[in-house]
């Protein structure tokens, strides 16, 4: 089943509760929460206190994507705030296995993310321990970027690795997702699609979300 996880990075922060209710009513499956520290990526967004507050307005699955250095130091905060899944970058921690296990020990699902130029071998050894791999299809840090086409064969290679290992792992794709690129990544094996500007910039939010699954 294909899941759509709108990124609230593209929402109107002045009306964040309303923006989340809007995507929930329109058929979103998850809420994708982009956490940036201004160091691992060249931008700052929000942290666990915002997650804790928006947790009060929806029961949707919270997928927290930590684009931060040394993510270990923030895991407790996001667990306490009500995150359902925490995704860390393989490039951002020296002890990926330990980090993933700590996330799971806190009662959350664990995901690992890769930047566009990072090879799949960085996650190969951790696959049996994760619930999801996030492949970035733009360089992280800002919304509204163009889709990097080489992500499509990368998704297919990852799906083969997962299937060959007999594992059941979601593949999430984030960056430049719209009604056209969504078809490409789904056919390659992606199961969770992150879309920010395509969903929040649409005149008809429900139709935009539906088009990502069509």
Language model feature labels by segment:
Residues 58, 106, 165-167:
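Helix C-cap/helix->beta junction micro-motif
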Residues 139, 146-192:
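Active-site/ligand-binding-proximal alpha/beta "capping" segment
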Residues 91-93, 115-117, 138-141, 197-200:
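Short, acidic/turn-prone active-site loops that include or flank metal/cofactor-
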Residues 100-102, 118:
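Predominantly soluble domains enriched in secretory-pathway, periplasmic, or organellar proteins
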Residues 117-119, 178:
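Short acidic loop-to-helix transition motifs that present clustered carboxylates
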Residues 83-91, 186-195:
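Short, electropositive alpha-helical surface patch
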Residues 1-87, 91-95, 102, 110, ...:
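Conserved N-terminal beta1-alpha1 strand-loop-helix module at the mouth
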Residues 112, 173, 194-195, 201:
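Hydrophobic residues in well-ordered beta-strands that form the structural core
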């Amino acid at each position: 089943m294909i899941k759509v996880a709108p990124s609230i990075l593209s929402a109107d922060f002045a009306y964040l509760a309303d923006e989340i209710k809007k995507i929930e009513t329109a058929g979103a499956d998850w809420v994708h929460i982009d956490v940036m520290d201004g160091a691992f990526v060249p931008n700052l967004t929000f942290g666990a206190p915002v997650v804790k507050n928006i947790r009060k307005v929806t029961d949707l699955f919270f997928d927290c994507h930590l684009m931060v250095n040394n993510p270990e130091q923030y895991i407790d905060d996001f667990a306490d705030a009500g995150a359902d899944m925490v995704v860390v970058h393989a490039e951002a921690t020296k002890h990926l296995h330990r980090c993933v296990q700590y996330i799971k020990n806190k009662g959350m699902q664990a995901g690992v993310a890769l930047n566009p130029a990072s090879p799949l071998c960085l996650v190969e050894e951790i696959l049996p321990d994760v619930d999801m791999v996030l492949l970035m299809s733009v360089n992280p840090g800002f919304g509204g970027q163009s889709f990097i086409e080489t992500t499509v064969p990368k998704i297919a290679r990852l799906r083969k690795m997962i299937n060959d290992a007999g594992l059941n792992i979601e593949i999430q794709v984030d960056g430049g997702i719209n009604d056209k690129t969504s078809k490409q990544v789904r056919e390659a094996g992606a199961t969770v699609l992150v879309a920010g500007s395509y969903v929040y910039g649409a005149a008809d939010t429900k139709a935009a979300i539906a088009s990502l699954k069509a």
